[in-house]
């Protein structure tokens, strides 16, 4: 049994997990702030920070690399043209997770994840 492999499975298959993170990332780029479970927010934080770091290079290849992950032209353009240049002087820490409440139906801890 291989422990400490670096990511959470989130109770999904690999394709479902990939689609979930992609959709959460697109929503975060478009809205700047979303509410999700704490565990999903932590996984999304790792995912989106890598994309922002890549996008901050500003090159054509960086643009293509971000599009390969997001598969959404509007979100990719917004990330590369508007969001990433704001963080050009930062080495990381582009997002913040703020715990908010427990979901009524299943008592899952929820949190806001937002771009700083």
Curated annotation (Swiss-Prot):
A biological process from GO: translation
InterPro entries in UniProt: Ribosomal_bL17, Ribosomal_bL17_sf
Cellular component terms per the entry's GO annotation: cytosolic large ribosomal subunit
Pfam families associated with the record: Ribosomal_L17
Keywords: Ribonucleoprotein, Ribosomal protein
PANTHER family (alphabetical): LARGE RIBOSOMAL SUBUNIT PROTEIN BL17M, RIBOSOMAL PROTEIN L17
Similarity remark: Belongs to the bacterial ribosomal protein bL17 family.
Name by which UniProt lists this protein: Large ribosomal subunit protein bL17
Naturally occurring in which organism (per UniProt): Wolinella succinogenes (strain ATCC 29543 / DSM 1740 / CCUG 13145 / JCM 31913 / LMG 7466 / NCTC 11488 / FDC 602W) (Vibrio succinogenes)
